[in-house]
């Protein structure tokens, strides 16, 4: 049996994507919509307090296309906290005018290739990646993915050293986009329908296309990658939520 990779796990992650029922939203009076927006922003303010205390992080983006209208990415120390956040949001008035579009549950993950005598949880660089402060980049791209398990193209039957070598080559492409694209990898085996979630942040949305296209030619993606639905969006600052929901 091939050897399993040891992973380092950080904050739990929820991607919550929803569509707005604009027709129903329009039936509310201006005052009712205003109250609903204020209630939602009060919930977001709680998230801001958690982020300020460095006990979690979140991001809020509008989604381009018909797949959804809004994407929330929430990071917390426990799965219970993610559930509480989702439940609190579902109890708001605004949620009555939202339709669930997609969700993804995972945990921020890094592969542990450090020397056995080094404690990765004492390494500041690793801690910053396991418990990240999500950037306020202009754009987001999220997609789930698997490693292929078909015939001779079975990632999980490859020897550990071969997988390490290929992943090192794969990661070199990503490092070429340092400063242009910020990446958060989250593991989801046993949590959701795919094995990983990939979240990319960039101020220049075209960098998503360039990075992902270049990686397609790397063996890890070309031979072993299986990809789910892609979602791309634009940042939604707190101060622009009211404008976004204005009728």
Curated annotation (Swiss-Prot):
Can you tell me which family this protein belongs to? Belongs to the ChdC family. Type 1 subfamily.
Q: Quote the record's binding site residues for Fe-coproporphyrin III.
A: 129, 143-147, 170, 183, 221
Cofactor binding annotation: Fe-coproporphyrin III acts both as a substrate and a redox cofactor.
Q: Write down the chemical reaction(s) this protein catalyses.
A: Fe-coproporphyrin III + 2 H2O2 + 2 H(+) = heme b + 2 CO2 + 4 H2O; Fe-coproporphyrin III + H2O2 + H(+) = harderoheme III + CO2 + 2 H2O; harderoheme III + H2O2 + H(+) = heme b + CO2 + 2 H2O
Tell me yes or no: is Oxidoreductase among this UniProt entry's keywords. yes
State the protein's name: Coproheme decarboxylase
**What EC class is this?**
oxidoreductase
Show the stretches that span the lipid bilayer.
none
The UniProt entry, under InterPro entries, shows:
CHDC, ChdC/CLD, Dimeric_a/b-barrel
Q: Which GO terms describe its molecular function?
A: heme binding; metal ion binding; oxidoreductase activity, acting on the CH-CH group of donors, oxygen as acceptor; peroxidase activity
Q: What is its EC number?
A: 1.3.98.5
A single GO BP: heme B biosynthetic process
NCBIfam families, A to Z: PRK12276.1
């Amino acid at each position: 049996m091939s050897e399993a990779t040891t992973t380092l796990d950080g904050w739990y992650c929820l991607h919550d994507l929803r569509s707005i029922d604009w027709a129903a939203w329009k039936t509310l009076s201006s005052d009712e919509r205003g109250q609903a927006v204020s209630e939602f922003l009060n919930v977001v303010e709680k998230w801001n307090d958690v982020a300020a205390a460095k006990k979690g992080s979140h991001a809020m983006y509008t989604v381009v296309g018909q797949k959804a209208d809004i994407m929330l990415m929430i990071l917390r120390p426990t799965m219970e906290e993610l559930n509480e956040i989702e439940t609190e949001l579902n109890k708001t008035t605004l949620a009555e005018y939202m339709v669930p579009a997609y969700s993804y549950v995972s945990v921020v993950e890094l592969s542990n290739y450090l020397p056995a005598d080094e404690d990765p949880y004492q390494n500041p660089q690793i801690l910053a990646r396991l418990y990240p402060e999500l950037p306020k980049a202009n754009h987001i791209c999220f997609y789930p993915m698997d490693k292929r398990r078909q015939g001779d193209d079975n990632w999980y039957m490859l020897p550990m050293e071969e997988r390490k070598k290929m992943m090192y080559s794969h990661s070199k492409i990503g490092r070429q986009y340092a400063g242009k694209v910020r990446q958060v990898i989250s593991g989801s085996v046993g949590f959701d329908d795919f094995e990983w979630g990939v979240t990319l942040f960039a101020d220049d949305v075209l960098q998503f296309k360039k990075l992902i296209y270049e990686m397609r030619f790397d063996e890890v993606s070309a031979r072993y990658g299986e990809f789910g639905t892609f979602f791309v969006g634009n940042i939604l600052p707190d101060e622009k939520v009211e404008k976004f929901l204005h009728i």
